[in-house]
Amino acid sequence: MPPSPLDDRVVVALSRPVRPQDLNLCLDSSYLGSAAPGSTSHPPVIATTVVSLKAANLTYMPSSSGSARSLNCGCSSASCCTVATYDKDNQAPTQAIAAGTATTAIGSSTTCPASQMVNNSENAGSLSPSGGVGSPMAGTPKQLASIKIIYPNDLAKKMTKCSKSHLPSQGPVIIDCRPFMEYNKSHIQGAVHINCADKISRRRLQQGKITVLDLISCREGKDSFKRIFSKEIIVYDENTNEPSRVVPSQPLHIVLESLKREGKEPLVLKGGLSSFKQNHENLCDNSLQLQECREVGGGASAASSMLPQSIPSTPDIENAELTPILPFLFLGNEQDAQDLETMQRLNIGYVINVTTHLPLYHYEKGLFNYKRLPATDSNKQNLRQYFEEAFEFIEEAHQCGKGLLIHCQAGVSRSATIVIAYLMKHTRMTMTDAYKFVKGKRPIISPNLNFMGQLLEFEEDLNNGVTPRILTPKLMGVETVV
């Protein structure tokens, strides 16, 4: 349907949601006739009109099959039609009908026969979606377009200015897209962590079924993010310099794409955290700051208080030594499990191996009692299923007067989680207290967010009596804490 010469726009209702570039729009020129000499079947062409396609401001509405596009009219109908607006652009009269290609703004092209395409010799009939930036687009673009960057020095100036004015709430919202363990070790002050390391969360974010807000790891970050409409948003990962070269599978790409779909205009920190820390390490934190964390899809409940806020420096995981958590309970890594001399010196007679692949070192010598808990350090691993089995083995070592070494690959996540749970079981420590206690002994610990969620659920069961605590005999070495 061509635009009316009396109107500036034509509104077309479509029966289903479509992308503007999928409409293959071309004006029906059959009524104009041919400009060929001697033709009498149609009147001569006296003018042409070039139209541009604009997507209406659409919003996501729920449906049984996921998110559906619908009008931004406040209705709750998932079947509400999609509206596209065609604005007329009057051009100078011309006598020619040119066959051409209608090229969309994102690079795809559609070729129409000459009899179906009205064109202008100066301007191609471009169908460019130029509506609101929040207009959803089906599919994933190969590259991020028009993403701006911010340099480390500029971000540092903004942060310093807000700090001096004592108005941190007026500063930019900073989003960390790196894995949670890396965020735990070091991050820019005030940055909120986006937990999209697992495939399920990434896919749901790409599909628009969840938003960036849903993946923020702490309540404080969520509250800050809700107030970003008048703020800058700065996103960073470890070392990205060119956002346009980030591949679609990377968390940075997914977060940026989601933010733009929500109508935001995020900036990317050039060079990421690595570049920022070179000159502004004083504006970075080296600790876990986690309030009411939860794993999306993991069912973790909220934490009751804040975990430790600072440690002297970034822990050296590779050079960490075997750590005595209690007089009889030691937390270590793969190398510690191989150190026969140290284990014998510490009277260790029991070993818990919390991996699926590391061997039971020295098993053939018959010097130790071994237990393997086959677990991976992933967001899907159910580690809680091994808690009671591990507790019984630890108690057996304790009653026999022997030390016990619990280890995984690095003594950071899996084995640390079980030690924290053991302290919660045998004392009145909260999850936060137990975490602080173990972190104070071994600063490198960093249970992944999935395991933190399981510890929170375990704490809830302990408090509700679903899982009983064992408080006698009292553990030695924690009297000043409990």
From Swiss-Prot:
Gene3D superfamilies: Protein tyrosine phosphatase superfamily, Rhodanese-like domain. GO terms for biological process: negative regulation of epithelial cell migration; negative regulation of epithelial cell proliferation; negative regulation of epithelium regeneration; negative regulation of ERK1 and ERK2 cascade; negative regulation of JNK cascade; negative regulation of p38MAPK cascade; negative regulation of respiratory burst involved in inflammatory response; negative regulation of stress-activated MAPK cascade. One of its GO terms (cellular component) is cytosol. Residues 199-215 are annotated as: Interaction with MAP kinases. It is found in: Cytoplasm; Nucleus. Pfam families: DSPc, Rhodanese. Residues 168-285 form the Rhodanese domain. Its EC number is 3.1.3.16, 3.1.3.48. Residues 321-464 form the Tyrosine-protein phosphatase domain. It is an enzyme of class 3 (hydrolase). Signal peptide: none annotated. GO terms for molecular function: JUN kinase binding; MAP kinase phosphatase activity; MAP kinase tyrosine phosphatase activity; MAP kinase tyrosine/serine/threonine phosphatase activity; mitogen-activated protein kinase p38 binding; protein serine/threonine phosphatase activity; protein tyrosine/threonine phosphatase activity. The active site is at C408 (phosphocysteine intermediate). The keyword Hydrolase applies. Belongs to the protein-tyrosine phosphatase family. Non-receptor class dual specificity subfamily. Protein phosphatase involved in the inactivation of MAP kinases. Has a specificity for the MAPK11/MAPK12/MAPK13/MAPK14 subfamily. It preferably dephosphorylates p38. Monomer. Interacts with MAPK14. This is Dual specificity protein phosphatase 10. It comes from Bos taurus (Bovine). The gene is DUSP10.
